[in-house]
Amino acid sequence: MSDNSPITSITAASLQPELWTSSSNDALQIYITDSDGTALNFHPNFTYPIFGDSEQIFGYRDLVIFLCFDHCTFYPFLNVKYSDKLNDDTLEDPREKLLSYLPESTIFKDEVKWVDSINKEKEGFEIPGELVGNIFTHGDDKFGIYKLDLKNAQGLELHKRLQILVLLFIEAGSYIDHQDELWDIYVMYKVTDEKTPSIIGFCTAYNYWKYGGFEKFDSNQQEVRKKISQFIVLPMYQGLKLGGRFYNKLYEYWMQDPRVIEVVVEDPSESFDDLRDRCDLTRLCQNTIKVASVDLPLINTEWATKLRQEQKLEKRQFSRLLEMILIYQLEHNLTNITKKQVRLFIKKRLYEKNKEILDGLDEPTRLDKLQTAYASLESDYKRILSGLSLHKRALDSTEGSSKKSKPNV
């Protein structure tokens, strides 16, 4: 099978179009070399940003697209193979399609040249970014998070090599404007072998300037809302709790930055929402409050407002966390509050959130809608809380994940 295979007429193909149609998700095979020279293989979650909504490629038989990256430099390699191709000048060329989304450094077909290029880049290799926080251990390995310098040629090149993963693994993901200096890009590496570190994943975050009042404006005190836009952990590192460590380390870094007043997330997927909820809950209950001390009368007081601001949490996320703590208290008999009190408290928030729609319904329908919404939310909270031991100061209970994003992660 090669890209120089026989060419078949379009007339013959029209009789059996299914033989000439390939799923782009199945055809595209992604390989990432490991530090020991082996290559780990997986398929993308999405290819519609590149090959269209149908995620199909027509005109080739036995189509296989190889997209390969080095674990350290992420140097890209592309090859396209097939057993037969239709004789039609209007056919979409998968090679050209993919190359338009990859950096100019991408090597096509010549594996020897690719390996030589990787080895050349690894000579005296240094991660093109600034270490965020400290090197930390997880299991038997060491890890570090680095903020890329996009004004540096090596930092910009690494960003261009990584960004195609946004299209392939984040629903509705899109490339960021790397010329916008308000974007931050953080890359997590395994640095057990300092000479050839391995990329674990990356995160993009946007800095929204927030007006803090004329006094702070006059004194040039900048305040920003840090919005997490894209968050990817490579598939072979998911399920190892590295996503949670990545998120927690970034949050610790932002907690120490006086300019950051709030951390928010742009359109998270369910899996990233779960990761975030578990991380935020664990951090809140381990470092700041005792689970049993959270009481209904406290939630709408200055205490709650101050706590939310200190923890740099957005209002909606903070409300969810407190509601989950109330459910957790009931599940573990840590409170004198009744289940009915908690239910009515949460229903009140749900009503206020959807007041305009609910007020247009008759009372029986409105009450039924609220009960259905509450039951669904309670079930989801219990699912998220499953396995967490918040009142015992348990260790981190999070998993690796990818986050979806709208026009950017």
Curated annotation (Swiss-Prot):
Subcellular location: Cytoplasm; Nucleus
Alphabetical list of SUPFAM superfamilies matching this protein: Acyl-CoA N-acyltransferases (Nat)
Lineage, uppermost ranks: Eukaryota, Fungi, Dikarya, Ascomycota, Saccharomycotina
UniProt protein name: Histone acetyltransferase type B catalytic subunit
Keywords in alphabetical order: Acyltransferase, Chromatin regulator, Cytoplasm, DNA damage, DNA repair, Nucleus, Transferase
Residues where acetyl-CoA binds: 231-233, 238-244
Matching InterPro entries: Acyl_CoA_acyltransferase, Hat1_N, Hat1_N_sf, Hist_AcTrfase_B-typ_cat-su, Hist_AcTrfase_HAT1_C
Residues the record marks as active site: 266 (proton donor/acceptor)
Organism expressing this protein natively: Debaryomyces hansenii (strain ATCC 36239 / CBS 767 / BCRC 21394 / JCM 1990 / NBRC 0083 / IGC 2968)
GO CC entries: chromosome, telomeric region; cytoplasm; histone acetyltransferase complex; nucleus
One Gene Ontology MF term: chromatin binding
